[in-house]
């Protein structure tokens, strides 16, 4: 729900979370070690609150330390090295096939799904999307440029699905 990389999520502490206006935001260190803020959806925010409550329960009513990692290993001693087993169990549980159109589904597939959904369904501004995901506009264009649909093309052209008529002939664009 954020488009962040797995390594970025793995290194988040509770103190990295904050409120900006009405949004929950987390500060992450990206692939190039550059710091950026990533906005959470309401679903992600609920999930993090549930994780926090579970951690308080594990700590017998105590709040976790601010510098504690959000995604801890089972023993509570450091970051989870791999989310692979949990991810595979989850997709099996919800009935999603392991094999997708482009090969096996992995946790990184969620990042691609996020970008695809933002472009196709949310008409996301590519500059904002690249900032949220910690990548360049050029990389978004390289990997997701093929997703420009008739709707988006119409939106960009200011015609939004209308046909252009010249004389009596109707053109399909």
Feature locations, PLM:
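Residues in the recognition helix of alpha-helical DNA-binding motifs
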Residues: 12, 51, 86, 90, ...
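Short, polar N-cap/turn motifs at the start of nucleic acid-interacting alpha helices
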Residues: 16-23, 123-143
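Catalytic-site neighborhood detector that most strongly recognizes the C-terminal catalytic loop/helix
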Residues: 27-34, 43, 133-158
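C-terminal catalytic core of Y-nucleophile DNA break-rejoin enzymes
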Residues: 30-50, 65-89, 106
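C-terminal secondary-structure termini that scaffold catalytic or DNA-interacting sites
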Residues: 53-67, 73-75, 142, 154-173
């Amino acid at each position: 729900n954020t488009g962040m990389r797995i390594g970025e999520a793995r290194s988040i502490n509770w103190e990295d979370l904050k409120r900006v206006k009405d949004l929950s935001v987390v500060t992450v260190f990206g692939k190039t070690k550059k710091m950026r803020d990533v906005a959470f959806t309401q679903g992600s925010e609920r999930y993090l609150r549930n994780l926090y409550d579970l951690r308080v329960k594990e700590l017998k009513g105590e709040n976790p330390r601010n510098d504690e990692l959000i995604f801890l290993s089972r023993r509570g001693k450091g970051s989870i090295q791999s989310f692979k087993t949990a991810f595979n169990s989850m997709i099996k549980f919800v009935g999603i096939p392991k094999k997708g159109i482009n090969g096996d589904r992995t946790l990184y597939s969620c990042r691609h799904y996020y970008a695809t959904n933002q472009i196709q369904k949310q008409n996301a501004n590519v500059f904002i999307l690249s900032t949220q995901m910690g990548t360049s506009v050029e990389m978004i264009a390289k990997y997701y440029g093929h997703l420009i649909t008739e709707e988006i093309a119409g939106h960009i052209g200011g015609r939004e699905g209308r046909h252009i008529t010249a004389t009596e002939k109707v053109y399909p664009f």
